[in-house]
Amino acid sequence: MLEIDNQTPLESDFLLLEKIANVLAPTQIIELILVSGETMREINRDLRGCDYATDVLSFPLEAIPHTPLGSVVINAPLAQTNALKLGHRLEEEIALLFIHGVLHLLGYDHEKDKGEQRQKESELIKIFNLPLSLIERTQDSF
């Protein structure tokens, strides 16, 4: 189940995100929060000590029955900018960020694992017919 807190003027169809949530965590609640760039910078600074606006952050919650799996926070204006720059729809960019964030909630960590998160993202991208994943874009830019 997906709970959405859209704190931006951005209007989007979240049906795809609900489908993704149902595939990744069919029995759990996932909170999606769409924020401005400034709000994302504040969250990143206050909680991670990084004074810049990033595209997506994940905050897992304790594994308590009937409580949310955690929160995925997406920088909506940056998602919009990246979608335009990369030539795909905003909904696709948000879906890519959402997948990336939810996988972190589920315990995947692309900085430490041996490619498991990248592999899972690739599988989901194929299932939902999405463009290049966040990890693949980052690795391809080096």
From Swiss-Prot:
Example of a GO cellular component annotation carried by this entry: cytoplasm
Membrane-spanning residues: none
GO MF annotations in UniProt: metalloendopeptidase activity; RNA endonuclease activity; zinc ion binding
One of the GO biological process terms: rRNA processing
Lineage, highest ranks first: Bacteria, Pseudomonadati, Campylobacterota, Epsilonproteobacteria, Campylobacterales
Protein name: Endoribonuclease YbeY
Family: Belongs to the endoribonuclease YbeY family.
Gene name in the database record: ybeY
Cofactor: Zn(2+)
Binding site for Zn(2+): H100, H104, H110
EC number: 3.1.-.-
Enzyme class name: hydrolase
Cofactor binding note: Binds 1 zinc ion.
PROSITE patterns: UPF0054 (PS01306)
Function: Single strand-specific metallo-endoribonuclease involved in late-stage 70S ribosome quality control and in maturation of the 3' terminus of the 16S rRNA.
Superkingdom per UniProt: Bacteria
HAMAP family attached to this UniProt entry: Endoribonucl_YbeY
Chief location: cytoplasm
InterPro entries per record: MetalPrtase_cat_dom_sf_prd, YbeY, YbeY_CS
Localization in the cell: Cytoplasm
Keyword entries, A-Z: Cytoplasm, Endonuclease, Hydrolase, Metal-binding, Nuclease, Ribosome biogenesis, rRNA processing, Zinc
Signal peptide: none
SUPFAM superfamilies per the UniProt record, alphabetical: Metalloproteases ('zincins'), catalytic domain
